[in-house]
Amino acid sequence: SAASDVYKRQVYATQDGTFSAVLFDGPYKLVTKDKNGPWVNNRDTIYVEVKGKTQCEVKVTPYFTISDENITLDNNIVSGTCNIQQIVQDAKISQAMLLVSKTTFVDENTNIARQNLSNINPGVTNISLDITSNQNVQSAKALFARIGVKANGADQAVYSEIFRLK
């Protein structure tokens, strides 16, 4: 179809990587953002023909993944452990972070407490954070935490599942 027949609309991925949009039937062009995300940069254009409920997958290759994660709260110490797997052979870890928030929306930019680790390698990683003197954390009715891992050169981290601490 001609370029003028293609509809344009911005769509944003959620924290779990999914995205959705309510669209009319017709041709669409999905253009990924350049140098965005915790994965190998691969600017791409995907043409999608929407007819009713339509699914579209955008495949990416993360620099790292996180597995076997666990986060606990005991005596004002938040302790996290995970296994960081290296997916891209020459990727290096910029930092790992333990992030705490009052809501399930917790990431590098949205948190009320954090502990960063640098100079780490893939494999089992332990990270802890003393929240004794953090009034924001102490006064929170609910606490959630997750671990993030950011690769050198990436603008975002890859994240673990979210754990409810209280």
Residue spans of the language-model regions?
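A short, solvent-exposed beta-strand micro-motif common in secreted/extracellular proteins
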Residues: 17, 23-38
